[in-house]
Amino acid sequence: MSAKEKFTSLSPAEFFKRNPELAGFPNPARALYQTVRELIENSLDATDVHGILPNIKITIDLIDDARQIYKVNVVDNGIGIPPQEVPNAFGRVLYSSKYVNRQTRGMYGLGVKAAVLYSQMHQDKPIEIETSPVNSKRIYTFKLKIDINKNEPIIVERGSVENTRGFHGTSVAISIPGDWPKAKSRIYEYIKRTYIITPYAEFIFKDPEGNVTYYPRLTNKIPKPPQEVKPHPYGVDREEIKILINNLKRDYTIKEFLVNEFQSIGDTTADKILELAGLKPNKKVKNLTEEEITRLVETFKKYEDFRSPSADSLSVIGEDLIELGLKKIFNPDFAASITRKPKAYQGHPFIVEAGVAFGGSIPVGEEPIVLRYANKIPLIYDEKSDVIWKVVEELDWKRYGIESDQYQMVVMVHLCSTKIPYKSAGKESIAEVEDIEKEIKNALMEVARKLKQYLSEKRKEQEAKKKLLAYLKYIPEVSRSLATFLASGNKELVSKYQNEISEGLFKLISKKLDLINIEEYRKVYRVDSE
């Protein structure tokens, strides 16, 4: 007879402690990178989303050489965190300010807490937080750990001091086992790629070797921040409907519920939906049965005349900032970008942006350099498993004038949405959703056509210059013949006319060849004509 099975439950904190790889913490190198990434993303969400030009300082110090423990500290000038929210914000897994129907860099309420869990698994130092909300007269300090069994914060130490320096923002320091030599290139690449799409931010990065890199602000233009919007009927299921109903503060009828709690539903649309679902408009929404909720959701899915989801919940980078960032980092001969119109998948709005940079200082390689972004987050790992890479690889670049297998090109794609279909909680690759894949392809083809036009004009220009250069060698002979004809045998006039004609012809051709050194060709001409 077999022994009885023992059943138990896990808190969210315990689950991610046991499965750190699901949150992007499979090893020390990746853990160090992921910690830097999560803290920078929190800092950006605390600044640009609220109209503040970001000033972000990142420091990584080796504090225990024998155990390879690093202290990661990120300081921002954002809106700060209300002190009563700090313990849960850093010490309770799946607690977040980002569970809203608008675009955010974070999604799961996990990121920095996963770093705290990984930290606790390997060393005993608590996370250190210093924060001051805008206009606060106090700076609040905390040292926290997570009670893994209860998924609750443990406040090791707390305090506050007078805010005499007018500081607002947050400083977070986490001590974590890491592998700097292996993580170094990824961390530098992550910061560089973040800077490409946030040229309105200032970054200062000090690495464990003492190297300090400064990324200056290039513009004061900040993208329009996303706004929280009501859910779209295409994007909700039965449980979400029930949550919306339970959270109602008013005693709505079903029709009032549809009109007031959803986007894209007015009086006329509500009447049509309720008729199709066989529901009475005046019935109290809190009296809906399980079967009636199911009918309502099924009607949502079948109804084909909803307006597309509102794009107010999204914040694009914008074509100007994309090109500014590409030009600053890669110094190309050509850069172009496109921001597509809003689309939707499963009721969630999304926008695809694409950019391309070509030539100049871009290194030549067997593949283009592909920059992947989701909600303004650079995606560094798992490149080949991402839908963006798939589309780039399948695109026929020869059709757009890229004739060689040697690429001197950067391709950038940004997907923003209220719901990014990541393949895992580590947020490093985007799943192959048909509507999104199609829109990425359309964006790349559109920006590739701009590149094709540039390359076509460049080739025509080179061909024209080649022809004009060929004409230069005939200047002595042509000018001599014309001078002889015009001088009618007068040898003194022949020499004079020849110089004038050759000079005029040379100026005419060299004007077309603005890259040609005039003095060099004049020297060549004089040698040839003697």
Swiss-Prot record:
Q: How does it assemble?
A: Homodimer. Heterotetramer of two Top6A and two Top6B chains.
GO MF term (any one): DNA binding
What general EC class does the enzyme of this chain belong to? isomerase
Instruction: Give the catalytic activity.
Output: ATP-dependent breakage, passage and rejoining of double-stranded DNA
UniProt lineage: Archaea, Thermoproteota, Thermoprotei, Sulfolobales, Sulfolobaceae
Q: Which family does it belong to?
A: Belongs to the TOP6B family.
Question: Which Gene Ontology BP annotations are present?
Answer: DNA topological change
Pfam family, any one: Topo-VIb_trans
Has the keyword Ribonucleoprotein been applied to this entry? no
Query: Which keywords are on file for this protein?
Result: ATP-binding, DNA-binding, Isomerase, Nucleotide-binding, Topoisomerase
User: EC no.?
Assistant: 5.6.2.2
Binding positions for ATP?
N42, D76, S96, S97, K98, M107, Y108, G109, L110, G111, V112, K113, K427
InterPro entries per the record?
Answer: TopoVI_B (IPR005734), TopoVI_B_transducer (IPR015320)
> Under what name is this protein listed?
Type 2 DNA topoisomerase 6 subunit B
| Function summary | Relaxes both positive and negative supercoils and exhibits a strong decatenase and unknotting activity; it cannot introduce DNA supercoils. ATP is absolutely required for DNA cleavage; the nonhydrolyzable analog AMP-PNP generates nicked or linear products from a supercoiled dsDNA substrate. Generates staggered two-nucleotide long 5' overhangs. The enzyme is covalently attached transiently to the 5'-ends of the cleaved strands.
Q: Which domain of life is it from?
A: Archaea
Q: How does activity depend on temperature?
A: Optimum temperature is 70-80 degrees Celsius.
Q: Which organism is it from?
A: Saccharolobus shibatae (strain ATCC 51178 / DSM 5389 / JCM 8931 / NBRC 15437 / B12)
Tell me what gene encodes this. Answer: top6B
**Keyword DNA-binding on this protein?**
yes
According to the UniProt record, one GO cellular component term is: DNA topoisomerase type II (double strand cut, ATP-hydrolyzing) complex
Record entry for activity regulation: Not inhibited by the DNA gyrase inhibitor novobiocin, instead inhibited by eukaryotic topoisomerase inhibitors such as m- and o-amsacrine, ellipticine, and the quinolone CP-115,953. Radicicol inhibits the ATPase activity.
